[in-house]
């Protein structure tokens, strides 16, 4: 899966073009406006560089490996995939990482670069529309974005 392009092969001009949308089901511009923020690498970079934020998430996952070991995990809004990667490194049996934007393509590359492609599956979808092949034991999410 690659980033969307226009007829000339250029990347999208509008932020909302970076979001996987099904206009027949979701006709609300607020949906696109919410997700467009997280669809760009520079926004992900800003969040990853926030030391307090990352330490809090890191400690919550990495200091509690028993919560993940052998479990099936759902990462809602995976973004860069960092929580999914940490869950896999803590021994999760399978991690389904759901991302509504084309950031999913970058997350997949990061997962593969960390040798975790057999454990972490990136699913480009909204959480409302994703169909998981099995029930999960643990749900994780960076639901606070910039507000932690």
Segments (PLM) and residue ranges:
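Conserved SAM-binding motif I beta-strand of class I
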Residues: 94-99
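Conserved class I S-adenosyl-L-methionine
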Residues: 71-77
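A short SAM/SAH-binding and catalytic strip from SAM-dependent methyltransferases
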Residues: 137-148
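Intrinsically disordered, low-complexity glycine/charged-rich regulatory or linker segments
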Residues: 1-45, 65
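Conserved alpha-helix/loop element of class I SAM-dependent methyltransferases that forms part
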Residues: 52-71
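Conserved short alpha-helix immediately C-terminal to the canonical SAM/SAH-binding motif I
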Residues: 102-106
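S-adenosyl-L-methionine
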Residues: 107-133
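Conserved SAM-binding loop of SAM-dependent methyltransferases across substrates and taxa
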Residues: 80-93
């Amino acid at each position: 899966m690659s980033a969307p392009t226009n007829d000339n092969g250029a990347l999208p001009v509008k932020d909302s073009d970076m979001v996987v949308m099904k206009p027949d089901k979701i006709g609300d511009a607020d949906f696109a406006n919410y997700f467009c923020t997280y669809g760009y690498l520079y926004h992900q970079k800003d969040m990853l560089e926030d030391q307090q934020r990352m330490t809090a998430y890191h400690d919550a996952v990495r200091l509690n490996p028993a919560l993940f070991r052998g479990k099936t995990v759902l990462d809602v809004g995976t973004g860069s995939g960092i929580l999914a990667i940490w869950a896999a490194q803590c021994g999760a049996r399978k991690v389904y990482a759901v991302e509504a934007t084309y950031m999913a393509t970058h997350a997949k590359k990061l997962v593969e670069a960390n040798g975790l492609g057999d454990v972490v599956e990136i699913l480009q979808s909204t959480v409302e529309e994703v169909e998981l092949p099995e029930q999960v034991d643990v749900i994780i999410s960076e639901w606070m974005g910039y507000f932690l």
